[in-house]
Swiss-Prot record:
This is Uncharacterized protein YhcK. The lineage of its organism: Bacteria, Bacillati, Bacillota, Bacilli, Bacillales. GO terms for biological process: cell adhesion involved in single-species biofilm formation; cell wall organization; negative regulation of bacterial-type flagellum-dependent cell motility. It comes from the Bacteria. The keyword Magnesium does not apply.
């Protein structure tokens, strides 16, 4: 008896790791499509059937931890997942043996699912809620053991309660821990690659992308691309006059407009305080010039709304260079683009300067 319950516990723990690896951050919300909720329910239902197969028979009744998969389905999937898991577990139980005990167990497990569904409506389910659910479901199961199918073994009830509560609490702890760890990993990964303020690449990720593009240019005949540097005109004055929080708002809006103007495959980055850069792979010289002008006009034509409601007209200066039209060495593009950016600032700002130099 204790051995079979322990086997159930080890199966449960193994499933929890597989479950979190399969669904990852999708476990933190239940607003999935019905089909995806059904997939969660199928996984929990399969677990319930496996637990019954590895349970033990006591006076024509199967004793196992199938109540825990129902709780997992409700808390991390919703009503569709719960209904799917219940259907699988019910069918599995009736197929194993069809008797009075099986019918009682089906009724009890369906009733036990109701508190889990009620708790699942909470935005955040804590371990204490899981503990309360286990107390309720275990009480229902013990009631069925004792009064409906005459299982009066106090040793059986004690072992079941200990293993069930341990398994249920451990299950939710593992799922929560693994899910939070995955979300934290995603957050760290995002912070390693993206600028936290604007949502575009940071300097390090942009340099990695640029080096990869240099290598592609060296390996691919007739490959062409452009590099655009841009700088917000008089940004220091904006910070001094409106404050750094409004300066941040300008940076955010520029990042947003930049992403809306270029292709999804064009890497954009914030490489300095108010300096941005864009790579245009597989882009001709004429097309790159048009894109640069479109970026400039997108920023200058519409004022930026600050957090205090004021509208601020902002302009940018852009410098650009193209491979192979401006140079035969891809690695020299940053120097040429930076020179053109300096020229754009020196000749009046709010303009695009494209390199005409051929090295």
């Amino acid at each position: 008896m204790l051995k079979e319950l322990f086997v159930n516990l080890t199966i449960l723990i193994t499933f929890n790791y597989l479950f979190t690896h399969l669904f990852k951050e999708r476990l933190v919300h239940k607003k999935d499509s019905i089909s995806f909720q059904a997939v969660k329910g199928l996984a929990c239902g399969l677990l319930g059937v496996i637990l019954m197969v590895f349970g033990f028979t006591y006076q024509h009744s199967i004793i196992d931890l199938r109540n825990i998969p129902i709780m997992i389905a409700a808390l991390y999937g919703g009503w569709v997942s719960t209904a799917t898991a219940l259907a699988m577990i019910t069918a599995g139980r009736l197929l194993i043996t069809m008797n009075t005990s099986a019918l009682y167990s089906v009724i009890i497990i369906c009733i036990a699912a109701i508190p889990s569904l009620i708790v699942s409506r909470r935005k955040k389910v804590q371990l204490k809620h899981a503990f309360y659910l286990l107390i309720i479901t275990n009480s229902l199961i013990s009631f069925s053991f004792y009064f409906l199918i005459d299982l009066h073994s106090y040793e059986l009830h004690l072992y079941f309660w200990i293993i069930s509560i341990a398994g249920g609490m451990l299950s939710l702890y593992i799922i929560d821990h693994e899910t939070n760890a995955h979300l934290l990993f995603k957050q760290y990964k995002f912070q390693a690659h993206f600028d936290f303020l604007t949502g575009v690449y940071n300097r390090r990720k942009f340099e990695e992308t640029t080096k990869a593009l240099y290598q592609q240019a060296a390996d691919t005949p007739h490959f062409q691309f452009a590099l655009i540097y841009m700088d917000i005109d008089h940004f220091k004055t904006i910070n001094d006059q409106y404050g750094h929080h409004e300066g941040d708002q300008v940076l955010k809006e520029l990042g947003l407009r930049l992403k809306q103007t270029i292709r999804n495959t064009d890497p954009a980055a914030r490489i300095g305080g108010e300096e941005f850069a864009v790579l245009l792979p597989n882009c001709s010289l004429d097309k790159a010039a048009r894109i640069a002008e479109r970026i400039r006009s997108t920023v200058s034509d519409a004022p930026i709304v600050l957090t205090n409601g004021d509208e601020l007209s902002v302009t940018i200066s852009l410098g650009a260079a193209h491979y192979p039209n401006n140079t035969e060495q891809p690695g020299s593009l940053p120097i040429l683009a930076d020179q053109m950016l300096y020229k754009a600032k020196e000749t009046g700002r709010n303009r695009v300067c494209f390199s005409e130099k051929k090295e």
